Amino acid sequence: MADDAAPHADVLNSTAQGQLKSIIDRVERLEVEKTEIAEQIKEVYLEAKGNGFDVKILRKVVRLRKTDRAKRQEEDAILDLYLSAIGEI
């Protein structure tokens, strides 16, 4: 299998090979950072839970804050309309 890979390396010139290696290295570094950040976020939620906060609601607040206020208000109005239509509110 290794012998099959060697001829393909000749297809790319040395500049393209360097760029490809650089791109792959950067993606791999970012994947490591993403994993580390995800672990830090998890720790923050555990801390919040330890302080008595509802983590499910905190996650919802974070998600809602990412949404444009006008879009969120429109979605809330439609949700209220649907809930009202089925007698839930």
Swiss-Prot record:
One Pfam family hit: GapR_DNA-bd
GO MF, one example: DNA binding
Superkingdom classification of source: Bacteria
Family, as annotated: Belongs to the UPF0335 family.
Name recorded for this polypeptide: UPF0335 protein Caul_0876
